[in-house]
Amino acid sequence: MEAITVKELLAAVHGELLQGDETAQILGVNTDSRTVKAGEVFVPLVGERFDGHDYIEKAISAGAEGCLCARVPETLLPGKFYIKVPDTLLALKDLAAWYRAQFSIPFVQVTGSVGKTTTKEMIASVLGVKFHTLKTAANYNNEIGTPQTLLGLSRAHQAAVIETGMDRTGQIRYLGEMVKPDIAVITNVGDMHIEYLGSRENILKAKCEIFENLKKDGLAVLNGDDELLNTVSLPQKTLRCGLSEHCDVRVSEVEDLGIDGIRCVVTTAKERYALSIPVPGKHMVYSAAMAAAIGEYLGETKEEIERGVAAYEPAGSRMHVITFSENRRLLDDCYNAGPQSMAASLRVLGASGGKKTAVIGDMAELGELTERAHKEIGELTKELGIDTVIAIGTRAKYFTEGNPSAQWFGSVDEAMGAVKAAFTAETAMLVKASHSMHFEKIVEELTKA
């Protein structure tokens, strides 16, 4: 973050200065009293189980220059500033929106049901060849992570790629009011969070909130093979990316190299790109095509775009292939799961050589689709010839309806012995479930064994 003054902060958050020097400089923003550094402003957030206002004195004592507060502390420490605001989370949003407005660089906002983080990372990899690029860390894509990402901007940055997630209506709009994108990306519309939104059509409406803050002369980049996204019509320039003939950015000549990755050709109105994607899964061609389209739009050369795709590295626990002795391969894709991403990952496993083991768990937030979706995934494991299926979790029991040979366990701890026993020589093992299942415990156990 570039230094700002208390006066600038005060104006950005529309607050009331209770105490402090308006000329004092602020070097950063922190919402965690445990990690606050000298010169930062502490923003106490209120959650279901905590109230950051209880830690204001601790943060100030640790070196914070001052704080925002909706609840004023009983004691105001001398030499520090205190700004009163109605709501600290909204103040954080206002500050991030004001700070982002100080930068005239291209901002890319990414959302979608599946593949947000992968696509964000791919775009950042491509843009990073030419531009010093800020990107959302991990998947810090909510009301707290997005402003923190934006507040990490510096004058050295030449582009920014911001991932925004949602589980309810209005969330993408809220985040977009901070990002104000020049380029808006929707990866697809799937069943994630359908429990809360009711239908794919409602999910589409929620995702399309991204366009409410897209600049009038901006660019929309959409999955051209997504039936619902093909109903979207915008006044802004729109590029549809995919395998279909109508796509503006066309993927062809897809060569599946198994766990070694994918090769494909991406053709735009201007250029033909021969792309080598260093991670498995045919679905990766969409992220690569979108990244190529954006790179070209922002003036990158053919060589820069091809090099950026080849340099892509997956974010943590997203189809991360770990190799072991005896040709054992662990496909760590445990960060999250929905029906579409689970099917895509199982197809990667199905294309792998040797014995194939799927360790799969609950797919959450599917509402009325829960039983059917899990049963269909079970059927897919049978169709793909997966040798061993280990299903874990309450919802995962429905996998066995689609594949009666699947082994079922109620919890990760109960299944651990069977998982270890199945990870034998010449085995490719996929580990995937919704984040709430904490399948990272399985990966940690296997990698330390």
Language-model features: where?
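Phosphate-binding loop of NTP-binding sites
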Residues: 8-11, 91-224, 228-237, 295, ...
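Mobile, glycine- and charge-enriched loop segments
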Residues: 33-44, 133, 151-160, 346-367
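Active-site beta-alpha connecting loops in nucleotide-dependent enzymes
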Residues: 49-50, 314-317, 334-405, 434
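ATP-dependent carboxylate/acyl-activation modules
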Residues: 110, 316-320, 436-444
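Peripheral docking tails and interdomain loops at the edges
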Residues: 408-410, 426-447
